[in-house]
């Protein structure tokens, strides 16, 4: 008798996973990684100190392309002047320029925030000679912390005889004078057009309309 056929193994009834869209999977994974990285970066990035905020304000002053991470010599001098690091006695403009040239790299034209702090340490020794090194640095930092560039150079009006002649209505003569009232306000059309005076009085007569008052006063 022939051997009975062995029963076939039961098929795996677990349905196979349907293949997903690879592009969607990659996008989801990328978003997950970016969100995790953003969270870690936000937690790792400390808040700027008041000194570094002042550094960045002066670093970008007058330069729309500046990032605030490096400072030019001109802005360094302005910071020292506006924040009164330069007192004209212990620290002068020359001292500030010398320190900047000493701290920056030979082929560089700017200084970083770390170099900025080194430069302040150099100036602190001169600015506060009667204090210890640490106290002097703290005093210099207090002069700068929270400060911003002082905006100056506002154009002022310059009075000159020529300008005054052209703008002061009280000095106008002839037909130009008739276009403005005593307050300097323009009369409009009345100041440009010769209107016929039909009052019966001679032009320029100053007592027009006073006859009736005189007659009534004499009675």
From Swiss-Prot:
Region feature (Disordered): 1-46, 171-192
Compartments (UniProt record): Golgi outpost; Cytoplasm, Cytoskeleton, Microtubule organizing center; Cytoplasm, Cytoskeleton; Nucleus
Effect listed in the UniProt record for changing residue 160 to E: In 4Glu; phosphomimetic mutant, does not affect G1/S-phase transition
Tissue: Widely expressed.
Annotated residues for binding of Zn(2+): 61, 72, 80, 83
Keyword terms: Cell cycle, Cell division, Cytoplasm, Cytoskeleton, Glycoprotein, Golgi apparatus, Hydrolase, Magnesium, Metal-binding, Mitosis, Nucleus, Phosphoprotein, Zinc
Biased composition (Basic and acidic residues): 22-33, 175-184
Changes after translation: Phosphorylated by LIMK1 on serine residues; phosphorylation may alter the tubulin polymerization activity. Phosphorylation by LIMK2, but not LIMK1, regulates astral microtubule organization at early stage of mitosis. Phosphorylation by ROCK1 at Ser-32, Ser-107 and Ser-159 inhibits interaction with HDAC6, resulting in decreased acetylation of tubulin, increased cell motility and entry into S-phase. Phosphorylation by CDK1 inhibits the microtubule polymerizing activity. Degraded by the proteasome; zinc-binding inhibits degradation by the proteasome.
Reaction equation(s) it catalyzes: GTP + H2O = GDP + phosphate + H(+)
EC numbers: 3.6.5.-
In-chain residues carrying the UniProt-annotated modification Phosphothreonine: 14, 92
Effect on the protein upon substituting residue 107 to E: In 3Glu; phosphomimetic mutant, leading to decreased transition of the G1/S-phase
Keyword Cell wall biogenesis/degradation carried by entry: no
One Gene Ontology cellular component annotation held by this UniProt entry: microtubule
Disulfide bond residue pairs: none
Induction remarks: enriched in cerebrospinal fluid of multiple sclerosis patients (at protein level).
Pfam family, one: p25-alpha
Glycosylation sites: 152
Residues with Phosphoserine modification: 18, 32, 35, 45, 107, 159-160
Variant or mutagenesis effect after changing residue 160 to A: In 4Ala; abolished phosphorylation by CDK1 without affecting G1/S-phase transition
InterPro entries reported in the protein's UniProt record: EF-hand-dom_pair (IPR011992), TPP/p25 (IPR008907)
Gene3D superfamilies: EF-hand
Subunit text: Homodimer. Binds tubulin; binding is inhibited by GTP. Interacts with MAPK1. Interacts with GAPDH; the interaction is direct. Interacts with LIMK1 (via the PDZ domain); the interaction is direct. Interacts with LIMK2. Interacts with HDAC6; thereby inhibiting the tubulin deacetylase activity of HDAC6. Interacts with aggregated SNCA; may have a pro-aggregatory role in synucleinopathies. Interacts with DYNLL1. Interacts (via C-terminus) with S100A2, S100A6 and S100B; these interactions inhibit TPPP dimerization.
Family indicated by similarity: Belongs to the TPPP family.
Annotated function: Regulator of microtubule dynamics that plays a key role in myelination by promoting elongation of the myelin sheath. Acts as a microtubule nucleation factor in oligodendrocytes: specifically localizes to the postsynaptic Golgi apparatus region, also named Golgi outpost, and promotes microtubule nucleation, an important step for elongation of the myelin sheath. Required for both uniform polarized growth of distal microtubules as well as directing the branching of proximal processes. Shows magnesium-dependent GTPase activity; the role of the GTPase activity is unclear.
Name of the protein: Tubulin polymerization-promoting protein
Organism: Homo sapiens (Human)
Lineage: Eukaryota, Metazoa, Chordata, Craniata, Vertebrata
């Amino acid at each position: 008798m022939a051997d009975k056929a062995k029963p076939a193994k039961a098929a795996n009834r677990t349905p196979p996973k349907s293949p997903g869209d690879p592009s969607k999977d990659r996008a989801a994974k990328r978003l997950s990684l970016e969100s995790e990285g953003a969270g870690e970066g936000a937690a790792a990035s400390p808040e700027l100190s008041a000194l570094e905020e002042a550094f960045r304000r002066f670093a970008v002053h007058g330069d729309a392309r500046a990032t605030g991470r490096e400072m030019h010599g001109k802005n360094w001098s302005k910071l020292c002047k506006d924040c009164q690091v330069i007192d004209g006695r212990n620290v002068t403009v020359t001292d500030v320029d010398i320190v900047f040239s000493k701290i920056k790299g030979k082929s560089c034209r700017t200084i970083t925030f770390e170099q900025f702090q080194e430069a302040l340490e150099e100036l602190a020794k001169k600015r506060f000679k009667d204090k210890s090194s640490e106290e002097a640095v703290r005093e210099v930092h207090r002069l700068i912390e929270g400060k911003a560039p002082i905006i100056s150079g506002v154009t002022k009006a310059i009075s000159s005889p020529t300008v005054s002649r052209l703008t002061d209505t009280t000095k106008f003569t002839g037909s130009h004078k008739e276009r403005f009232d005593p307050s300097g306000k323009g009369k409009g059309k009345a100041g440009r057009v010769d209107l016929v005076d039909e009052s019966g009085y001679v032009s320029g007569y100053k007592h027009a309309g006073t006859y009736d008052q005189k007659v009534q006063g004499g009675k």
